Regions:
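Fe-S ferredoxin-like electron-transfer domains
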Residues: 45, 54-153
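N-terminal cofactor/phosphate-binding cores enriched in small/glycine residues
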Residues: 10-67
Length: 153
């Protein structure tokens, strides 16, 4: 079956998702909740794309391709929508290191370690440097969160 993503035509397997086809062909669509060993969860909504003929944006991780489908995966409108979604997610999680302008050359270990040993900064996190959340924040160029922080430690 043929699928077009951002003007490029691809062959796709039946039951493949938009995200599967994009990744197989080197097109980056940010996502946080998708995992190859799990069924599509569509919880984070960061992988939203537009499908010609459908109203609104749909999650690429949970939308199966159809023959002749035309998908827009990259656009300023989608990036704005993804930024808003990610800012809402970050408003409920510790995010200071993720959006700090000094995050790539932090002069100190800017972390908060509570009595229980909880690390809320990226510097001491065992996934620092290979975290999908860091990649998505960088890709969407998020440098502030306009929603109030609601997380509890």
């Amino acid at each position: 079956m043929k699928v077009t993503i951002d003007g490029r035509a691809f062959e796709a397997a039946e039951k493949a998702t938009i995200l599967d086809v994009a990744r197989a062909n080197g097109i980056y669509i940010p996502s946080l909740c998708e995992h190859k060993r799990l069924a599509p969860f569509t919880a984070c909504r960061v992988c939203l794309v537009e499908v010609q003929g459908r109203r609104g944006a749909v999650p690429a991780c949970g939308t199966h391709v159809e023959d002749g489908m035309v998908v827009t995966a990259q656009s300023p409108a989608l990036d704005k929508l993804r930024r808003t979604v990610l800012e809402l997610i970050l408003s409920e999680h510790p995010h200071a290191c993720l959006i700090c302008s000094e995050r790539t050359a932090c002069p100190e270990h800017k972390t908060t370690i509570r009595k229980v040993g909880e690390v809320t900064g990226c510097v001491l996190c065992p996934n620092n440097g290979r975290c999908e959340l860091q990649d998505v924040v960088e890709y969407l160029k998020i440098d502030r969160v306009k929603f109030p922080a609601l997380f509890r430690n």
